Amino acid sequence: MNKNLSLKLAPRSKIDGVIKPPGSKSITNRLLLLSSLCNQSISLTNHLISDDSKYMIKALEDLGVSISSDTKDKITIFGDPKKFNNSADLFLGNAGTAYRPLCALLSILGGNYRLDGVERMHERPIKDLVDSLSSIGADIKYLKNIGFPPVQVSDFKFNGKTDISIKGNISSQFLTSLLMAVPLIGQDFKLNIDGELISKPYIDITIKLLKLFNVNYINHNYSSFEFNCNDNPKLYSLDSGLIDIEPDASSASYFFAAAAISGNIRVEGLSKESIQGDIQFLEVLEKMGADITYNNDSIDVRKANTLVGGQFDCIAIPDAAMTLAAMGLFTSSPLELFNINSWKVKETDRIVAMENELRKFGATVTSTENSLKIIPPANISDNVSVHTYDDHRIAMCFSLACLANKSVEIQDPECVNKTYPNYFNDFLKLLS
């Protein structure tokens, strides 16, 4: 990847057309991991092909899992945790959806595993997850800074403790990692959540997929989860060997937003019944004035007569909230986002990054540890060069600025390879 590259987006005034974004990153990486735990072959269609999913696939292959790409849109996993290699050196880039779940899984399976990533991964906290796993007998050592990757995972010595606690207000990936891994202990178990649970819709994805894989649990209103793993011969098995993955709702948010700003878009493959939390972004767009139509297998968004601002709780849509922030350049009144503290531990500190880049376009921006307020500019600045911080979502959300009929330069556009390698090609085809 050449980080010195940039992409110049010409001034545009409208977006129009039909698009089907690639498969959901959150669903793809969860399914890859869960499929590797099944003693059967499982095929996934419409899976995401991106840096994050490639890191997960490579790690699973390094662990001894056989994975074949049958066609461009279909992949088959031949899993069995009993056949995992006893040692491996895994490099996981900046893929939190791979690093954290694999850390939990391998610490319970036991063995000799080193988990590393890029420099930004070394800054993303993992201490709460490690502390929870260590409390039941996991042996995890920090190789550089305490509380952060890289880590070394060694043999698991289960101490008989049948409950575990995890903080809910740091990252939902910690809870997701435990939810997918603790059933491997093979006995009844309880997971307790301390404090408020952020990004709850991402937990909903996890528990719905666990049900699919015959993992039995009781959800006590998201304050705790009880697993019933004794005498469950179907644990980590799938009744059907084929799963079709729905398009990524976070990736769809850029097209939904573009239409609300200036145009008409139909996104295929998604419906109101999507299991992804970012589908709730459409409710925000409706409040801002956009016209939304839900079809059986597609969603239409049409331009708002006036795109209004407002105050929005983003706890359920942390990724789509990035798109919402970029829309603050176009609103007729101030836009305020709150409950976005999870932004600080993502690919970059997104609160700082968004504040910096929005100001380049002329917006007045203030922030706290948990909120961002945007007062739109009277005139959006032309020829702005957007620094993307190696963050795919910053690159994609600021592409919307060209719809102000302004030129926009996106630095390091290939950072979108993390979740949507063809984003700019797809976006440009729809512009007029």
Regions found by a protein language model. Give the residues of each.
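Structural preference for solvent-exposed beta-strand-turn elements
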Residues: M1-S432
